[in-house]
């Protein structure tokens, strides 16, 4: 696998592939990779001739009191895992490469509406940071296809909306959430959990599953939500949000809506965990 922190190197290699009529898939990451990321790379390899990955801990998407400095950097292990999964080109830029004028002077991309709810309400500016860095990476790599995990459901919709609104010729593919045997969604932030917290953490998925089952049985949105919040608190969580939304727009779900998604974010110990369930009733 070729690794470079320089934009020109990435563009030169991609152009060489393009000159031969070959296709390119892209998987952007922040590193500290787990099996969910590796699944994205393997899926990417099945879609296109070549796979490009990136590792960049993006300061623009972290808030003032979030874990930017504490976010694990594990480049050697990540590189080995990416190579084994089929990535051929790895972009590892520094903040100075991506934001040479600094964050305050950086042109940014903002997707209105869908960026302002749920995680966007809890983490102001987060999705502006996500949209900006993903747009920059898309312009550098210029892939045919880009893959993202469904675990970050709101992020996936933000990126799909950005691509559609800006007429970017890139197919965005969401890949199913990869889970531990307990049902806990794999996340780089699971490493913050103590043994006791990790044992309790599957309650997040269990609460979401119970909400969906209740809705399908005719229970009200309010009833299933309050029951799920109580279960989370009993398990040691502090809920941030637990909401039922329209699966395509993330607007508040109405009783007549068929395409639904339950989205949750909750704190346990030092970790803020997110999960979701997309379903039709």
Curated annotation (Swiss-Prot):
Species of origin: Shewanella baltica (strain OS223)
Its job: Catalyzes the condensation of pantoate with beta-alanine in an ATP-dependent reaction via a pantoyl-adenylate intermediate.
Annotated positions binding beta-alanine: 61
Enzyme class per UniProt: ligase
Catalytic-site annotation from UniProt: 37
Lineage of the species this protein comes from: Bacteria, Pseudomonadati, Pseudomonadota, Gammaproteobacteria, Alteromonadales
GO biological process, one term: pantothenate biosynthetic process
Molecular function as annotated in GO: ATP binding; pantoate-beta-alanine ligase activity
Assembly information from the UniProt record: Homodimer.
InterPro entries, per database record: Cyt_trans-like (IPR004821), Pantoate_ligase (IPR003721), Pantoate_ligase_C (IPR042176), Rossmann-like_a/b/a_fold (IPR014729)
Pathway note: Cofactor biosynthesis; (R)-pantothenate biosynthesis; (R)-pantothenate from (R)-pantoate and beta-alanine: step 1/1
Compartment(s): Cytoplasm
Record-given protein name: Pantothenate synthetase
Chain sites annotated for binding ATP: 30-37, 149-152, 178, 186-189
Binding site for (R)-pantoate: 61, 155
UniProt main location, coarse: cytoplasm
CDD domains associated with the record: PanC
């Amino acid at each position: 696998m070729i690794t470079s922190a320089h934009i020109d190197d990435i563009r030169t290699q991609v152009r060489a592939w393009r000159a031969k009529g070959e296709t390119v898939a892209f998987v952007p990451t922040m590193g500290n990779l787990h099996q969910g990321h590796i699944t994205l790379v393997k899926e990417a390899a099945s879609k296109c001739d070549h796979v490009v990955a990136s590792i960049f801990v993006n300061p623009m998407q972290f808030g003032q009191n979030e874990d930017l400095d504490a976010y694990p950097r594990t480049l050697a292990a990540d590189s080995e895992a990416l190579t084994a999964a089929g990535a051929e080109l790895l972009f590892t830029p520094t903040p100075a490469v991506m934001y040479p004028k600094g964050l305050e002077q950086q042109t940014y991309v903002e997707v209105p509406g869908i960026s302002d709810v749920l995680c966007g309400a809890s983490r102001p500016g987060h999705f502006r940071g996500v949209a900006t860095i993903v747009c920059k990476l898309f312009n550098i790599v210029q892939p045919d296809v880009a893959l993202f995990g469904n675990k970050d459901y709101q992020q996936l919709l933000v990126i799909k909306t950005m691509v559609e609104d800006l007429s970017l010729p890139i197919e965005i593919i969401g890949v199913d959430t990869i889970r531990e045997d307990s049902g806990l969604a794999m996340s780089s932030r699971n490493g913050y959990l103590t043994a006791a917290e990790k044992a309790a953490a599957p309650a997040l998925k269990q609460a979401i599953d119970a909400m969906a089952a209740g809705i399908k049985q005719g229970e009200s949105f309010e009833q299933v939500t309050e029951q799920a919040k109580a279960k989370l608190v009993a398990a040691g969580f502090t809920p941030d949000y637990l909401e039922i939304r329209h699966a395509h727009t993330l607007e508040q779900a109405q009783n007549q809506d068929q395409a639904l998604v339950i989205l949750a974010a909750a704190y346990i110990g030092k970790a803020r965990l997110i999960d979701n369930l997309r379903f039709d009733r």
